[in-house]
Amino acid sequence: MSSTHKKRKLKKTAKIIFVILILALIGGAGAYCYVNRDKFFTQPKKEEKKEEKPKEEPKQPKDYEAKMIMVGDALIHWGVYNDAKTPDGGYDFKPQIADFKQISSKYDIAYYNQETVLGGKELGVSSYPLFNSPYEVGDAFIDAGFNMVSLATNHTMDKGEQGVLNSVNYWKQHPEVAVSGQWSSEEERTASIQKVYEKNGITYAFISYTIWNNGLKTPWGKDYLNSEYTPEKAKADIESVRDKVDFVIVAMHWGTEYSFKVDYKQEEIANYLSSLGVDLIVGAHPHVIQTVESINEGKTFVVYSLGNFISDQNDVDNFTGLAMEVTLKKHVDVDDTVTCSVVDPKAQLVYTTTKYIGYNTNFRIITYPKLTDDQLRNHAGYYEQYKAIVNERYPNLTWGLSGEA
């Protein structure tokens, strides 16, 4: 074989080997890429951002409060009726308390004592000794912002069972008003005692009792008509609702008529009610004002007598009444501990002014600071005299109501 031929053969063999090597390299690279395809062809995963939970704000203590005003008896005598008569034969008592409405309408809770039964005109309007008042009395007080009414008095049964039933039916038409002291059945009484009222995040119960009945007892088996006080009844009533509410408010018709002094029975009942967990006791019946007091290490605030709010008992002592303000305050701590207290008591005196024309007319309720000498001579002297009575057991009492501002 010639050398030229051998060289050609070697070149050809070299080309073949070169091609084989190239193919081997390509194949190896392809195999490597296939095996590691995830590394080359898979998009890198984006890092998922973890959602940051909002930081919880530290728990803060909370405070709730409801401002309450209390006034005394709506004791409606002939003079008050006659002054309120309208040409159409009806009654309008609103002008008589219009000035005080500017104060009472500013409060969360506004209380008064309805001394005379609202039996309505159909039973005959009457005055002392057996009272019966038209529904328009209630209308006037509701219009002035009053939304808590005590009905248990020594005059509840003045018109018998029908008088009470008429009164109960009237107040049923005003569910926005908390009433206590008269009911038409035992079931209604129980529901009323255990009813939970609420204002501004504060819950409260309201119960009314009287220790007097003027010898006019309820019919046998119908004690619910007038809420007469016994220690046993009060204990059962209060225990049935105490743990359901922040505050228990009790209205007591008690004390000695026309006496500025608190008697032993009032003190005894007040201390007993306080031991049951009552926070606020509001008194009526004496028809004159008495002192106020914080008892049981501040657990219970007692207003022994608010006196008359409106009447025709023609004497300065009876024309003078007490308007009392307190704040029901609830504090909820960060550990949910709840503390409730009756705080910031404030007081003002009110007076029933009249125009005398052989009899009293033009009845108006105004506060003592607004009195003139024409309306009451020596009103400044009376003011200091009556303030001293109220201050007897609470000497640091603040005078002047928030609602007067």
Segments from the language model and where they lie:
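Acidic, metal/ion-coordinating pockets
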Residues: 2, 16-18, 24-405
